[in-house]
Amino acid sequence: MNILKVIIWFTILWVALVTCCLFYLRSCEWNPEKAAEYVTRNAENKSVGLCAKYVRKAIVAGGIPLYQGGDAWSYKYLLPMLGFKRIENVNDKKVGDIVVFQPIGKRYFGHIAMWNGSQWVSDFKQRNIIVHSDYRNDSCEFAILRKGE
C-alpha cells in the first residue's frame, strides 16, 4: 500500500470518528438550568482570565461532555456543531444562552459568558453583557447561541 492510500484511509477513519462523536454530543440531554447554576456557583469575585474554561465546565455540568475547549472565540464555531443556534434578538435571553465575543484589541482570545436568568456569568459575575470597553466598538462581532431552537 502506498503512502497516499494510507493517508486517504486514515482521513476517512478520522472523519467518520469525528462525525460519530458530533452526533453523540448533539444528542446529549442539555439542562441549561444546571449549567447556569454551575457557572454562577463557581464564579470568582473578579475576572481571572479563564472565561472559556469556566463556561466549558458549565456546559459539561449541563449535560454535554465537552472535554476540550479552545479560546472563547472558537466556541462560536464549536457550539453550532453541538446543536446550538444563533439567536438574533439580544433581548430574548433564556437561561443557558451563551454569548461569544470576537478577539479585539488586547483581548486576544475573545470572551464568552452564560446567561443565568438574571446576569451574564463567565469566570466572574458580570454587570452586563459588555465586560470591557474594547467590546463597545461597533465593529466588534458577537453571537448569542442557544441549544435546541
Predicted segments, located by residue:
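Positively charged n-region of N-terminal signal peptides that target proteins for export
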Residues: 1-6
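Low-complexity, Gly/Ser/Thr/Pro-rich intrinsically disordered linker/tail segments
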Residues: 140-149
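...with weaker cross-activation on analogous glycine-rich loops/strands in unrelated enzymes
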Residues: 67-132, 136
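Short, intrinsically disordered low-complexity segments
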Residues: 25-27, 92, 145
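N-terminal capping segments
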Residues: 7-70
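Generic alpha-helical secondary structure signal
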Residues: 42, 58, 79-81, 139
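Terminal low-complexity, poorly structured segments
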Residues: 9, 75-78, 141
